[in-house]
């Protein structure tokens, strides 16, 4: 998950699969609020 978050922080494009993984992790509550706030 960390590489996907780093892409997000750098405003880089993500693949559809990466976006799905990120969204699923958010929905399941697997990310800390501090990770989402950046």
Swiss-Prot record:
Matching Pfam families: Glycos_trans_3N (PF02885)
Keywords for this protein: Amino-acid biosynthesis, Aromatic amino acid biosynthesis, Glycosyltransferase, Magnesium, Metal-binding, Transferase, Tryptophan biosynthesis
Broad class of enzyme this protein falls into: transferase
Reactions the enzyme catalyzes: N-(5-phospho-beta-D-ribosyl)anthranilate + diphosphate = 5-phospho-alpha-D-ribose 1-diphosphate + anthranilate
InterPro entries found in the cross-reference section: Glycosyl_Trfase_fam3_N_dom, Glycosyl_Trfase_fam3_N_dom_sf
SUPFAM superfamilies assigned to the protein according to its UniProt record, in alphabetical order: Nucleoside phosphorylase/phosphoribosyltransferase N-terminal domain
Entry's Gene Ontology molecular function annotations: anthranilate phosphoribosyltransferase activity; metal ion binding
GO biological process: L-tryptophan biosynthetic process
EC number: 2.4.2.18
Transmembrane found in the keyword field: no
This protein's pathway: Amino-acid biosynthesis; L-tryptophan biosynthesis; L-tryptophan from chorismate: step 2/5
Keyword Calcium carried by entry: no
The protein's assembly and partners: Homodimer.
Family, similarity comment: Belongs to the anthranilate phosphoribosyltransferase family.
The protein's role, per its UniProt record: Catalyzes the transfer of the phosphoribosyl group of 5-phosphorylribose-1-pyrophosphate (PRPP) to anthranilate to yield N-(5'-phosphoribosyl)-anthranilate (PRA).
Name recorded for this polypeptide: Anthranilate phosphoribosyltransferase
Organism of derivation: Serratia marcescens
